[in-house]
Amino acid sequence: MKNTQGKINELLNESGCEHNQHKHGEKKNKSCSQQAQPGAAQGGCAFDGAMISLVPIVDAAHLVHGPIACAGNSWGSRGSLSSGPQLYKMGFTTDMSENDVIFGGEKKLYKAILEIHKRYNPSAVFVYATCVTALIGDDIDAVCKTAAEKIGTPVIPVIAPGFIGSKNLGNRFGGESLLDYVVGTAEPEYTTPYDINLIGEYNIAGEMWGVLPLLEKLGIRVLSKITGDARFEEIRYAHRAKLNVMICSRALLNMARKMEENYGIPYIEESFYGIDDMNRCLRNIAAKLGDPDLQARTEKLIAEETAALDLALAPYRARLKGKRVVLYTGGVKSWSIISAAKDLGIEVVATSTRKSTEEDKAKIKRLLGADGIMLEKGNAKELLQLVKDTQADMLIAGGRNQYTALKARIPFLDINQERHHPYAGYVGMIEMARELYEALYSPIWEQIRKPAPWDEDMGILAHEYTSNHDHILASIEELI
């Protein structure tokens, strides 16, 4: 896949996105067609975006062609879990040096691919371009093609060097690599009328494992997972699914749209967070598959699960009802978590709109109401001031804001991809309620908000001094 300016513009002007110029004309978000601006990669560059989209393919090797820091500084940042192979957790890099920059790194890359195949025998090798290797002009496509012919294993180039744009653009390039080199290259053993693909679900903290059993109960088969806990082979025959389900992510929208164009697979966009969204997701999948019996089974399952969930959540709702939180995260989580919080009786008084589409912002306005605050961006000082002004009880944000909250003695819950607890599906709601309860009612808050013992002693002494000057000297002598 040659990464030309035309290709970049094509992905930036995604026709399935409401920001596209054909849909909005003059109102189009200008960032869709602009060159990457300085700072656009803050919080994740295009290389990082492509990598975190594809690394969850657990039986493949992922080789970063560039300086060692490109792999080392970003490896393992997304907590995707595997139910089997662990090869995806091993970081491979060509460790480009100054000599390689001068003389080229193509031979080094070729040898690295052969060595990985010899020692680990992966199902496939994904090779990621970085800024350095793109700037010196290494022909990664040609090297991958030659190596694949030599070892008889697919070698997929992922040309998304960091300087071309943001993490979201890199996600789309990852999807393009799958479309160009993987999807449609194999056939499944059999198909059913109930085969679906999950796109944009990365199995963070094992979240997908709380949803798959529900689909199995309904007789729905997940043919391919793109890409959480995925095997390379299943992505090869993803083109035989009857429906693509986009989960809480528009970053791989290009993949869903092109699979509809190329293979006639319709797609829907859903969320696994919150009771209402989970119910809606199951209903919409059943409706799209078009089987009345499946729809009846879905309603029965929803009734059973929500009844059991209400019993499990009752003690948490009693303690969480009326609590106020500030939500500071990005993308679809800025509205999907609001829905989950409302199910627990929690009031979200403010949320961020970073990386949110216009559709996301409309959902936020509807969920928050007229009094809700929408933050475009904010630093630590502004966040703490917002918590104070809104009298919020808690900050829900990503790990980078953890110490901001803890230093201010504010309860905190990590909601981003680094977390270790699954919040999706019905079982995820129970886990989220438990985490919120434990964070809010931890005994540590009462302890750390008390004055220090020496401050208490001095306060007592000051009071005694002002009330009875004659006794203060004796008190000081006793303490000394």
Swiss-Prot record:
Pathway: Cofactor biosynthesis; Fe-Mo cofactor biosynthesis. Residues 12-35 are annotated as: Disordered. GO terms for molecular function: nitrogenase activity. It comes from the Bacteria. Disulfide bonds: none annotated. Keywords: Nitrogen fixation. InterPro entries: Nase/OxRdtase_comp1, Nase_comp1_CS, NifE, NifE-like. GO terms for biological process: nitrogen fixation; protein-containing complex assembly. Gene3D superfamilies: Nitrogenase MoFe cofactor biosynthesis protein NifE, C-terminal, Nitrogenase molybdenum iron protein domain. Signal peptide: none annotated. This protein may play a role in the biosynthesis of the prosthetic group of nitrogenase (FeMo cofactor). Belongs to the NifD/NifK/NifE/NifN family. NCBIfam families: nifE. This is Nitrogenase iron-molybdenum cofactor biosynthesis protein NifE. It comes from Nostoc sp. (strain PCC 7120 / SAG 25.82 / UTEX 2576). The lineage of its organism: Bacteria, Bacillati, Cyanobacteriota, Cyanophyceae, Nostocales.
